[in-house]
């Protein structure tokens, strides 16, 4: 290393002289300080001069590195290992001068080294970090302002119940809310000492969980406790909607050191105070082919309770728990303290005592006793309030009576009012001009008729929109004929128009399909005049979940809260309900929907088979080859033919050749095909016409393919058989079928496959050989003339030209 210093100094001085720069002393001083480590691998300075005079004389670092890979000159790579030293002393620059580029650079390496570092940093930031080795620092300033919204956060949604962007743009979504889904699909028994007016104005308003005394769930199967896997005893439900046994959930909560624990199903927080009593009732699950009974429902606009038309009453407050007839149609059921005590608390106490008697000697008994203790505390609280609150209840009832009677007295003072502009409820933007109320007598009956008439076209309109929204039907011209249902002498006005629709009799959210609604409207004039109950066979059931778009299209279902699950059921209405003329009028829509169901079923079966085949291929199982043998034309069956000349020869000739007759079981399966496809020779047919099955010629009863072609025209005389009746479309390709063997029932013409065309061409050629010629070639032999050699016939050609 000390010997290389003079040569390196000489090289640096030569470079300074050639450059002619005034800053040569500074550059040479700095180059002397770092020349020894560079000169060891650079070699003599004279060798580097010619290389830098060419196209790389501009000082390009990329070309220098490619042509001299052993020379560590590239700043992007050489500077990385020395960056730690350069950071210690900013004034001391260890960067070597560029070879051969001193004359072309207007600035020296020492005075502008900082700018080069910036350029190198900018170039390095443009590439991925994987392209550089060693310690590196990546500029991440472009990530400083990067933010994202966490999943499930409803930051951009307003308090109106739907996203502000989601209504205008389809990509907007509303985050899933477990409590909203639970409250939309369940019925709640709440305490009666609270105000629930907000729940009658907005169906999406959540019930305060502290006011809930019991939750009622209607499901198609009885739920089971996910901890003990048995039907829950004294069941409790969490805010996330999962049901447990009371003793099981207490045992689970005791395992946590905190006052709460995560739900074992959805990992939501479960608090002991949030556990509510729950009762699950099993309902029938209807399927296609079942008979269902639907009843006519009536609901006023602006009211969120729909009741049967036969039991309809004006509902302005929640239904009481004791009303058994109407309790299944309300989301909220008011319960007094006595009702909660007798119908909720005491029933749970009895179930827990029975469970304790059965599992008294099990480790679970301590948690059962803890549940019984909590029931007793709740019982004492309710019984104390119920016993001491009798006087307060009487005072409140008297006050309510006074408040309810006050509007009746004040309303009579403003009775003689003239026509004013009245608006409907908040769910409808229409306004109607009310006529004078002076003659109330003759106008009373028309008002009722007008209310029915106004509500019915709206129900029909909802049915049309619902049909369009489902994408399964179109509105026909029949609906336009039903529009003038209203009487011409009346004005279309109504203070509270009603919706009419059909719902399942047991209270499930199953509604009648718009196609059936149009049939009933055509038959009876309006839904209000339709039967109160109809029974028919289920044809199709489509499930939906209530959303903002669905609510706008199905306005008669606006009383259902968001995320509420419901079904649209199509029935096969029969003449007892609707006439044959009505069914014929809507036969096109019914048939169209039937074809759509069949197509959907075929697509589902194809998808299932495709998935099954893919799964079998993964496991190494491939489908078996299936060769259908039902085509008797391509695979003829063995039949014993009777010769027409047997009757003329008599019984002796039949007995003489009886040894040559073959039975169907005397041949092997392989000889059946050869026997059927091999005709008789003309000699055998002439000499012994009684041979109906076969003949011997040249020690062989069979002919070669060339002999068969040579005597093909004479085959008809020697082979008596009944010509099969062929249809005109025998050579027509079969109906197009799919890969799974199911016809699509469409008029499309498929592309013919090579296999079908080849077999059909061969069959057509053989059929031409089977047809007898117009002139008999044997007559020429009898005349003494030599029979000419027949021209060979071409059976099949692939139209491929072979050149020599």
Curated annotation (Swiss-Prot):
It comes from the Eukaryota. The gene is Rnf10. It is an enzyme of class 2 (transferase). Interacts with MEOX2. Residues 1-134, 589-611, 646-665, 715-804 are annotated as: Disordered. Its EC number is 2.3.2.27. The modification Phosphoserine is found at residues 5, 110, 128. Belongs to the RNF10 family. Pathway: Protein modification; protein ubiquitination. Residues 646-655, 795-804 have a biased composition (Polar residues). GO terms for cellular component: cytoplasm; nucleus. Residues 114-124, 601-611, 715-729 have a biased composition (Basic and acidic residues). This is E3 ubiquitin-protein ligase RNF10. It catalyses: S-ubiquitinyl-[E2 ubiquitin-conjugating enzyme]-L-cysteine + [acceptor protein]-L-lysine = [E2 ubiquitin-conjugating enzyme]-L-cysteine + N(6)-ubiquitinyl-[acceptor protein]-L-lysine. Residues 1-31, 78-90, 104-113 have a biased composition (Low complexity).
């Amino acid at each position: 290393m000390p010997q290389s210093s003079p040569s390196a100094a000489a090289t640096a001085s030569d470079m300074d002289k050639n450059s002619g720069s005034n800053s040569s002393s500074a550059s040479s001083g700095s180059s002397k300080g770092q020349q020894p480590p560079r000169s060891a691998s650079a070699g003599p300075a004279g060798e580097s001069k010619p290389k830098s005079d060419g196209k790389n004389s501009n000082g390009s670092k990329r070309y220098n590195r490619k042509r001299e890979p052993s020379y560590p000159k590239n700043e992007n790579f050489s500077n990385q290992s020395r960056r730690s030293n350069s950071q210690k002393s900013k004034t001391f620059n260890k960067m070597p001068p560029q070879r051969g580029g001193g004359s072309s650079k207007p600035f020296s390496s020492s005075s502008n080294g900082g700018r080069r570092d910036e350029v190198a940093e900018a170039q390095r930031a443009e590439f991925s970090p994987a392209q550089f080795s060693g310690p590196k620092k990546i500029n991440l300033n472009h990530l400083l302002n990067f933010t994202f919204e966490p999943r499930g956060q409803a930051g951009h949604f307003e308090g109106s119940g739907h996203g502000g962007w989601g209504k205008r743009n389809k990509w907007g979504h509303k985050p899933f809310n477990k409590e909203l889904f639970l409250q939309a699909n369940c019925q709640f028994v709440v305490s009666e000492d609270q105000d629930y007016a907000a729940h009658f104005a907005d169906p999406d308003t959540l019930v305060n969980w502290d006011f809930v005394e019991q939750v009622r769930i209607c499901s198609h199967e009885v739920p089971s406790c996910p901890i003990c896997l048995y039907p829950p005893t004294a069941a409790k439900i969490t805010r996330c909607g999962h049901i447990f046994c009371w003793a099981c959930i207490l045992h689970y909560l005791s395992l946590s050191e905190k006052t709460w624990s995560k739900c074992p199903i959805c990992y939501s927080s479960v608090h002991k105070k949030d556990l509510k009593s729950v009762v699950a009732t099993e309902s029938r699950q209807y399927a296609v082919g079942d008979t269902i009974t639907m009843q006519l429902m009536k609901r006023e606009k602006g009211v969120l309770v729909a009741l049967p038309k036969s039991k309809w009453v004006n509902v302005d407050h929640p239904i009481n728990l004791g009303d058994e007839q109407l309790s299944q149609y309300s989301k909220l059921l008011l319960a007094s303290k006595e009702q909660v005590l007798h119908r909720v608390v005491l029933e749970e106490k009895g179930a827990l005592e029975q469970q304790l008697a059965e599992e008294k000697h099990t480790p679970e008994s301590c948690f059962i006793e803890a549940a019984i203790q909590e029931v007793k505390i709740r019982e004492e609280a309710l019984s104390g309030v119920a016993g001491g609150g009798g006087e307060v209840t009487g005072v409140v009832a008297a006050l309510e009576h006074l408040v309810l009677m006050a509007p009746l007295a004040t309303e009579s003072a403003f009775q003689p009012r003239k026509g004013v502009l009245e608006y409907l409820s908040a769910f409808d933007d229409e306004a109607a001009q009310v006529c004078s109320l002076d003659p109330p007598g003759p106008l009373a009956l028309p008002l009722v008729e007008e209310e029915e008439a106004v509500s019915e076209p709206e129900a029909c309109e909802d049915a049309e929109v619902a049909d369009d929204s489902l994408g399964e039907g179109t509105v026909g011209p029949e609906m336009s004929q039903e529009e003038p249902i209203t009487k011409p002498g009346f004005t279309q006005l109504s203070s509270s128009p009603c919706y009419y629709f059909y719902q399942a009799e047991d209270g499930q959210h199953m509604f009648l399909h718009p196609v059936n609604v149009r049939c009933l409207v055509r038959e009876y004039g309006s839904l209000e005049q339709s039967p109160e109950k109809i029974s028919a066979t289920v044809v199709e059931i489509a499930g939906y979940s209530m959303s903002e778009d669905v609510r706008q299209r199905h306005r008669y279902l606006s009383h259902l809260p968001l995320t509420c699950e419901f079904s649209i059921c199509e029935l096969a209405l029969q003449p007892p309900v609707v006439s044959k003329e009505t069914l014929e009028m809507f036969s096109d829509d019914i048939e169209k929907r039937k074809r759509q169901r069949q197509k959907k079923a075929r697509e589902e079966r194809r998808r299932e088979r495709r998935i099954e085949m893919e799964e079998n291929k993964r496991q190494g199982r491939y489908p078996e080859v299936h060769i259908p043998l039902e085509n008797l034309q391509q695979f003829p069956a063995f039949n014993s033919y009777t010769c027409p000349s047997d009757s003329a020869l008599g019984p002796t000739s039949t007995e003489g050749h009886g040894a040559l007759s073959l039975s169907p079981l005397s041949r092997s399966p392989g000889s059946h095909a050869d026997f059927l496809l091999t005709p008789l020779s003309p000699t055998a047919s002439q000499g012994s016409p009684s041979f109906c099955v076969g003949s011997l010629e040249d020690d062989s009863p069979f002919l070669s393919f060339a002999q068969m072609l040579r005597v093909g025209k004479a085959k008809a005389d020697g082979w008596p058989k009944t010509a099969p009746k062929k249809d005109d479309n025998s050579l027509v390709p079969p109906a197009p079928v799919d890969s799974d063997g199911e016809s699509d029932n469409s008029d499309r013409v498929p592309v013919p496959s090579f296999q079908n065309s080849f077999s059909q061409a061969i069959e057509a050629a053989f059929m031409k050989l089977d047809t007898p010629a117009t002139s008999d070639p044997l007559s020429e032999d009898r005349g003494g003339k030599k029979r000419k050699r027949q021209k060979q016939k071409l059976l099949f050609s692939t139209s491929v030209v072979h050149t020599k």
